[in-house]
Amino acid sequence: QNYNILLTGGWDGVVNIFDLRSSGPVCQYQFENKVYSMSCVKDLFVVGLSEIKIGIFNLSKLQNKIFKPELIFNSHLKYQTRKICVFPDGKGFAEGSIEGRVAIKNIRDLNNLPQINTENGTTIGKDDQGKDDFAFRCHRNTKNNPPLVYAVNDIAFNPIYGTFSTVGSDGIYSIWDKLNRSRLFERNDVQDKTPLTSCDYNSNGNLLAFSMGYDWSRGAEAAKEYNAGLADRKSVV
């Protein structure tokens, strides 16, 4: 919103910047990995990649016509990234994975990120793990032995309260308090545990909308079990 641009990314590994007044991209960056998820607030633009890698851009450098990641590093989660969502203040991001985990990563100074060169590129060193960074499990059925683990399909931050929601392949939506590292609310209003595929808040932060449908987490055969339907509108206080 600050820059009046459109960002796109795809499995070809290309991230494009479009000025809506022109037909083609004005800037482009080619990753070696597929792009799975992207999120941008203010100057912070974060890209979730295949092979569990994360790319961080500083969009303030666009004024100097520089469009390349400040950092490419290995995610602190062990399995495929499903969703990236930048904090409303642009000072960090949440990352969800197919393993039913969410990681919270704070960016203390976007203009002074640690640069540690390795054979595989640039990575964040251990000393960059701040005290406010953490990860937690979610979207799991612990009544089973072993527990059933579901993907985190989407993450959305409330623009007013700073809390955030997750939705998953288990058909559950949860609301979390990042500062106190606790779950505030959890509910499943969807019949037959149809996966929830995406979610978002309105600008006032009092409505949470989510979409539902099969997310292919159980392969093609399981798609026959799910039927499309309408979700009720939900009010979040």
What are the residue ranges of the model-derived segments?
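WD40-repeat beta-propeller superdomains and closely related acidic/aromatic-rich repeat-like regions
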Residues: Q1-V237
